[in-house]
Design a protein with these regions (language model features):
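A short SAM/SAH-binding and catalytic strip from SAM-dependent methyltransferases
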Residues: 114-128
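Class I SAM-dependent methyltransferase SAM/SAH-binding core
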Residues: 52, 59-103
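N-terminal, positively charged/glycine-rich alpha-helical extensions of SAM-dependent methyltransferases
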Residues: 1-21
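Short conserved loop adjoining the S-adenosyl-L-methionine
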Residues: 103-109
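Conserved alpha-helix/loop element of class I SAM-dependent methyltransferases that forms part
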Residues: 31-47
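Core SAM-dependent methyltransferase catalytic element
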Residues: 187-201
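Conserved beta-strand signature within the Rossmann-like core of class I S-adenosyl-L-methionine
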Residues: 143-152
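Short alpha-helix
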Residues: 163-179
């Protein structure tokens, strides 16, 4: 089974009519999802910014941002058509595109002020470390001001083999080494027992 087939199978099995968004997206609760969003945004002032949300799902991050900020330009991308359809049905103030950014990137360097991504590195694809570094390379090329994403923490007490868990220390070392001349890498921990957030600024 290819990586894309794994991703589609996982999320299509979760796509149950009438179930809440957090379940469809594979999160444990709406409260946990909100905590993740709070850390993703952090102290970034998004007013007047252009935003790319990679793996936008059903548009929940846009809903969160819209409660905090009023003037911004949001684009969400996802590889799954049913996610984009559900996001579009909400009539939110943003643009949703079904595409695989990692196969075909239509954007030029520094197109967006901020790039967010929540949850796309969670499934165990057997090459997660490589995928992470390749993805961050794309994110930082697209972003003018900041990149923010979250990962599952290898100190989680309830690990599941279908997910991949990262070491915050290793991630910080690898990214700081690669982008020492261009980005400051920060790790945020402690808001959930199984999750941490990475900021490039």
């Amino acid at each position: 089974m290819s990586h894309m087939e794994k991703i589609k199978k996982y999320y299509e099995e979760n796509n149950v009519e009438g179930y809440p968004d957090y379940y469809i997206l594979g999160w444990e609760s709406e409260a946990a999802q909100e905590l993740r969003f709070k850390q993703l945004v952090g102290d970034i002032d998004l007013n007047g910014k252009t935003i790319l949300d990679v793996g936008c799902g059903t548009g929940n991050l846009l809903e969160y941002i819209s409660r905090q900020f009023k003037t911004f330009n949001y684009t969400g991308s996802d590889v799954l058509p049913h996610m984009i359809q559900r996001a579009g049905e909400k009539k939110l103030d943003g643009k949703f595109i079904c595409m695989d950014l990692f196969k075909s990137n239509p954007y030029g360097n520094k197109t967006f002020d901020v790039v967010f991504s929540s949850g796309i590195f969670n499934l165990n694809l057997e090459n997660n470390q490589e995928f992470l570094m390749d993805a961050v390379d794309i994110f930082q090329n697209l972003a003018r001001e900041a990149v923010s994403f979250n990962l599952l923490w290898d100190k989680s007490k309830d690990k599941d083999p279908k997910y991949f868990y990262f070491s915050p220390e290793e991630v910080q070392e690898n990214l700081s080494s690669k982008y020492r001349d261009t980005w400051r890498v920060s790790i945020i921990k402690g808001y959930l027992h199984n999750d941490f957030t990475v900021h490039l600024s």
